[in-house]
Amino acid sequence: MIDNIRQIAFYGKGGIGKSTTSQNTIAGLAEMGERIMIVGCDPKADSTRLMLHSKAQTTILHLAAERGAVEDLELDEVLLTGYQGVKCVESGGPEPGVGCAGRGIITAINFLEENGAYEDLDFVSYDVLGDVVCGGFAMPIREGKAQEIYIVCSGEMMAMYAANNIARGILKYAHSGGVRLGGLICNSRNVDREVELIEALAERLNTQMIHFVPRNNVVQHAELRRMTVIEYATEHPQANEYRTLAKKIKENTKLTIPTPISMDELEELLVEFGILGGEEEYQKAIAQDAGKAVVV
């Protein structure tokens, strides 16, 4: 029964490390014996590559275009099994500049539901592009598919801006679809006072920073080999960070309706933590950078 499945979604600004974070977290959940399916909802189709050790999985939309209709597909053509038995699907998207990428998500989820893909699962994880919360990309939220949203962010201004926008999208459908915000995952960029900053943002958004993932080069080393850190470097401290995050998500009961803030409030927060200074500080920083310049 779909009603008994924990349906979670990872949203976040493009380039924030959302797909990497989500796959490493799913690997941690799978290690605990959870039965999981990943539904990639990003046109880049990179939501399952670390689980499958592949460049990119063939997407539902791509195969449907080849066959003429999604009804002509078989489930085992688009649903593959990856690391620790995790089921993997990519919805895909249209050619750049043509059509609505969000439509691929709608098509994919409907196809999966109609063909029994949700049977015998504990978790379904949607990995969703989060720069633009348009109708299509908001579909897992709008239709009540994803009940728990985790926003991957960092202490950088645009990542926080995207997180606030996603919170606004969650709020819009919280009462009609029952979706809730599970927390912010800080995927560190080594910004000054990053932990304090994201904790403060979480408080303003009426949520929690569920985990702080430190920056470590082993993540890139694993990615180059198309593996999660948990598989590539099982005993590495970074692998344990993802295991801790997975455990926190499994045990999370703090699911809230977010309270998004205005752009002015976001800028005030950045000023408060010294990330975005006033004009005087800005000019001082430029002068300092100029002084450090080396003429060759």
Curated annotation (Swiss-Prot):
Belongs to the NifH/BchL/ChlL family. It comes from Trichormus variabilis (strain ATCC 29413 / PCC 7937). It catalyses: N2 + 8 reduced [2Fe-2S]-[ferredoxin] + 16 ATP + 16 H2O = H2 + 8 oxidized [2Fe-2S]-[ferredoxin] + 2 NH4(+) + 16 ADP + 16 phosphate + 6 H(+). GO terms for biological process: nitrogen fixation. It is an enzyme of class 1 (oxidoreductase). ATP binds at G12, K13, G14, G15, I16, G17, K18, S19. The gene is nifH2. Binds 1 [4Fe-4S] cluster per dimer. [4Fe-4S] cluster binds at C100, C134. Disulfide bonds: none annotated. This is Nitrogenase iron protein 2. Keywords: 4Fe-4S, ADP-ribosylation, ATP-binding, Iron, Iron-sulfur, Metal-binding, Nitrogen fixation, Nucleotide-binding, Oxidoreductase. InterPro entries: NifH/chlL_CS, NifH/frxC, Nitrogenase_Fe_NifH, P-loop_NTPase.
